[in-house]
């Protein structure tokens, strides 16, 4: 079966969209009319070309790909419309295995005037009834047909388990010459293995009354051994998964737990490879998940602010530790942040494991359904491209931070919008002050508006400066593609220390580590989309309270002041001390001030060079 359009590599899709965007309006509309039946939707996509940096072909293919259109369908349409240059871009991606003719032969499945969207719906109907699905072909002038058999992309192996060590032995199937029990025992270690009898006794043979929850790949039970409570994760095969998926999941889970030893990562206490089941054993978390506590499950009291921020700090440090080992969690959400008896957070249920290899239509439909359940914590670029990077974990941490700050669940089908991320991303650029101007206090005003609208009231009183700093930290995770997790950790840690009432000497580098803070030099950012907000802490010039001769603060310094309040400078930090006036005329004077009009012009010129302002806004009033 041909692969789907959304499985095309990014470089192939970029070349294809760049080629199709240069077509004449007539040719492009002719191509699009075969794809979309709804003229309103077609005009909506066509109107996006007025937005700078938006490829209307990419939007069109995204719309079509989400309806499970195949690459073969796209290739047949391009050949039918004689757009051979665009078709050749796809053909160059994979070698052509069989070409019977240079002219495509169209069948009666799709005729001119009958758009491809209808054929996609027919395909979905056949999938539901269990009938075999064949990509539609297009009628042509010749009797022969060209069918380019594009092989499916390689198996999505455990790409998230990026390590410098050789993983070839782990990614292969277990050897037939080595017993399975012996292979897994060498992987996990004898000290971790439980006997099948012990697991059955501890869980009362997995009694349904001991079941806590049901997951995608496992059921979770509570059990006891010698009076100590444990959690047992019983792995199970999915109808849509490929052969050996349980073994691969088990193998990857043990790998991750053995490599990670961190106070905020849920430890693996044992595992069992019985004849009838696979099981993983974890410590029992007395206070459940962060999601349950935020939503008051079981009548629990709301978490106070010191506990909330301490939990966020622990989560960020756990993810930072995983990233230092080149491990991507891929499943960061509030329900996977477990709390022990002391409310210490433990990050659990990593999804960094090999995906099933059986790419049938039922598996694809099931995977899409499961994928939509986690969309609330995933960035838009991952949803479109599907490439798992550290950016996915950082974005998910931003959503968890937002849940803690607002008390609003990440997904609510009775709310508009359904996802919390859409609510925040809509509110960020809709602040009363234009966020593209980089004026003084823009981010502070934006954070203040969000706090006034959505800050959790049941957790008690949180100082305004601390709340704004946490909001800006969450926005940093959500809006900046190259966001540094160390910056977010520094901001949250500063607020945590202030709430604890401890007097600490914070570095003057602020939220950013290793970032230059030269005057009138904007921070380089890489935004997720083309909105005006760049999610970075923009350049400001505000005097430090109490320092009469200090230079204007940069974004990093002011961000730390927002996070930690007014903190006196450490005497050992020379960079924080106000510079002495120059003794002669040859020295650079920090007292030179630029008037506001010239400063604004310089900032606007920088924005103009970044193509964030046009000439009218640059020289306008």
From Swiss-Prot:
<feature type="domain" description="Death">
    <location>
        <begin position="13"/>
        <end position="94"/>
    </location>
</feature>
<dbReference type="InterPro" id="IPR000719">
    <property type="entry name" value="Prot_kinase_dom"/>
</dbReference>
<dbReference type="Pfam" id="PF00069">
    <property type="entry name" value="Pkinase"/>
</dbReference>
<feature type="domain" description="Protein kinase">
    <location>
        <begin position="206"/>
        <end position="476"/>
    </location>
</feature>
<dbReference type="Pfam" id="PF00531">
    <property type="entry name" value="Death"/>
</dbReference>
<comment type="function">
    <text>Binds to the IL-1 type I receptor following IL-1 engagement, triggering intracellular signaling cascades leading to transcriptional up-regulation and mRNA stabilization.</text>
</comment>
<protein>
    <recommendedName>
        <fullName>Interleukin-1 receptor-associated kinase-like 2</fullName>
    </recommendedName>
</protein>
<feature type="compositionally biased region" description="Polar residues">
    <location>
        <begin position="503"/>
        <end position="522"/>
    </location>
</feature>
<feature type="compositionally biased region" description="Polar residues">
    <location>
        <begin position="157"/>
        <end position="169"/>
    </location>
</feature>
<dbReference type="GO" id="GO:0070498">
    <property type="term" value="P:interleukin-1-mediated signaling pathway"/>
</dbReference>
<feature type="binding site">
    <location>
        <position position="233"/>
    </location>
    <ligand>
        <name>ATP</name>
    </ligand>
</feature>
<dbReference type="GO" id="GO:0005634">
    <property type="term" value="C:nucleus"/>
</dbReference>
<feature type="region of interest" description="Disordered">
    <location>
        <begin position="113"/>
        <end position="175"/>
    </location>
</feature>
<dbReference type="GO" id="GO:0031663">
    <property type="term" value="P:lipopolysaccharide-mediated signaling pathway"/>
</dbReference>
<comment type="subunit">
    <text>Interacts with MYD88. IL-1 stimulation leads to the formation of a signaling complex which dissociates from the IL-1 receptor following the binding of PELI1.</text>
</comment>
<keyword id="KW-0067">ATP-binding</keyword>
<dbReference type="GO" id="GO:0008063">
    <property type="term" value="P:Toll signaling pathway"/>
</dbReference>
<dbReference type="InterPro" id="IPR000488">
    <property type="entry name" value="Death_dom"/>
</dbReference>
<dbReference type="GO" id="GO:0035556">
    <property type="term" value="P:intracellular signal transduction"/>
</dbReference>
<dbReference type="GO" id="GO:0004672">
    <property type="term" value="F:protein kinase activity"/>
</dbReference>
<dbReference type="InterPro" id="IPR042151">
    <property type="entry name" value="Death_IRAK2"/>
</dbReference>
<feature type="binding site">
    <location>
        <begin position="212"/>
        <end position="220"/>
    </location>
    <ligand>
        <name>ATP</name>
    </ligand>
</feature>
<feature type="binding site">
    <location>
        <begin position="333"/>
        <end position="336"/>
    </location>
    <ligand>
        <name>ATP</name>
    </ligand>
</feature>
<keyword id="KW-0547">Nucleotide-binding</keyword>
<dbReference type="InterPro" id="IPR011029">
    <property type="entry name" value="DEATH-like_dom_sf"/>
</dbReference>
<dbReference type="GO" id="GO:0005524">
    <property type="term" value="F:ATP binding"/>
</dbReference>
<dbReference type="GO" id="GO:0043123">
    <property type="term" value="P:positive regulation of canonical NF-kappaB signal transduction"/>
</dbReference>
<feature type="region of interest" description="Disordered">
    <location>
        <begin position="503"/>
        <end position="534"/>
    </location>
</feature>
<comment type="similarity">
    <text>Belongs to the protein kinase superfamily. TKL Ser/Thr protein kinase family. Pelle subfamily.</text>
</comment>
<dbReference type="GO" id="GO:0005737">
    <property type="term" value="C:cytoplasm"/>
</dbReference>
<dbReference type="InterPro" id="IPR011009">
    <property type="entry name" value="Kinase-like_dom_sf"/>
</dbReference>
<dbReference type="GO" id="GO:0005886">
    <property type="term" value="C:plasma membrane"/>
</dbReference>
């Amino acid at each position: 079966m041909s692969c789907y359009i959304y499985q095309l590599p990014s470089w192939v899709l970029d070349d294809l969209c760049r080629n199709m965007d240069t077509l004449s309006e007539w040719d492009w509309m002719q191509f699009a009319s075969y794809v979309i039946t709804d003229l309103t939707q077609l005009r909506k996509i066509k109107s996006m070309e007025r937005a700078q940096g938006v490829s209307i072909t990419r939007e069109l293919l995204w719309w079509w790909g989400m309806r499970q259109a195949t690459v073969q369908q796209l290739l047949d349409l391009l050949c039918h419309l004689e757009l051979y240059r665009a078709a050749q871009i796809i053909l160059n991606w994979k070698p052509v295995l069989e070409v019977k003719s240079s002219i495509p032969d169209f069948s009666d499945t799709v005729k001119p005037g009958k758009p491809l969207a209808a054929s996609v719906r027919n395909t979905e109907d056949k999938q539901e009834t269990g009938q075999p699905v064949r990509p539609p072909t297009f009628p042509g002038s010749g009797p022969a047909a060209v069918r380019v058999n594009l092989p499916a992309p390689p198996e999505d192996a455990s790409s998230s388990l990026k390590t410098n060590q050789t993983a070839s032995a782990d990614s292969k199937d277990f050897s037939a010459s080595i017993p399975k029990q012996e292979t897994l025992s060498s992987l996990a270690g004898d000290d971790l293995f439980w006997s099948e009898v012990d697991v059955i006794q501890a869980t009362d043979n997995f009694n349904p009354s001991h079941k806590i929850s049901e997951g995608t790949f496992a059921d979770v039970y509570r059990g006891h051994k010698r009076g100590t409570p444990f959690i047992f994760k019983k792995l199970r095969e999915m109808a849509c998964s490929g052969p050996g998926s349980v073994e691969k999941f088990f193998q990857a889970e043990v790998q991750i737990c053995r490599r990670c030893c961190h106070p905020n990562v849920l430890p693996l206490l044992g595992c069992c490879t019985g004849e009838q089941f696979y099981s993983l054993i974890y410590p029992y978390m007395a206070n459940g998940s962060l999601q349950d506590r935020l939503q008051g499950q079981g009548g629990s009291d709301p978490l106070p602010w010191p506990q909330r921020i301490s939990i966020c700090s622990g989560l960020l440090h756990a993810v930072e530790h995983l990233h230092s080992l080149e491990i991507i969690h891929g499943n960061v959400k509030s329900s996977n942040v477990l709390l022990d008896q002391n409310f210490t957070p433990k990050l659990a249920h990593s999804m960094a494991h090999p995906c099933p290899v059986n790419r049938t239509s039922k598996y694809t439909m099931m995977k899409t359904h499961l994928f939509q359940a986690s969309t609330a914590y995933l960035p838009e670029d991952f949803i479109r491209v599907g490439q798992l990077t550290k950016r996915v974990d950082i974005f998910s941490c931003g959503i968890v931070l937002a849940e803690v700050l607002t008390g609003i669940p990440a997904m609510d089908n009775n709310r508009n919008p359904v996802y919390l991320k859409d609510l925040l991303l809509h509110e960020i650029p809709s602040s009363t002050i234009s966020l593209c101007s980089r004026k003084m206090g823009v981010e502070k005003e934006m954070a203040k508006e969000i706090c006034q609208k959505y800050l959790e009231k049941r957790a008690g009183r949180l100082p305004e400066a601390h709340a704004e700093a946490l909001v800006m930290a969450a926005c940093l995770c959500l809006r900046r593609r190259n966001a540094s997790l160390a910056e977010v950790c520094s901001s949250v840690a500063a607020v945590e220390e202030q709430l604890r009432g401890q007097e600490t000497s914070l570095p003057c580098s602020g939220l950013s580590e290793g970032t230059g803070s030269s005057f009138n030099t904007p921070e380089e950012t890489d935004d997720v989309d083309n909105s005006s907000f760049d999610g970075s802490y923009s350049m400001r010039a505000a005097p430090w309270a109490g320092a009469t001769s200090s230079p204007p603060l940069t974004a990093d310094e002011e961000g730390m002041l927002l996070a930690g309040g007014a903190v006196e400078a450490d005497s050992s930090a020379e960079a924080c001390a106000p510079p002495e006036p120059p003794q002669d005329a040859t020295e650079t004077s920090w007292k030179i001030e630029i008037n506001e009009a010239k400063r604004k012009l310089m900032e606007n010129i920088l924005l103009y060079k970044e193509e964030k302002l046009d000439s009218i806004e640059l020289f306008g009033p």
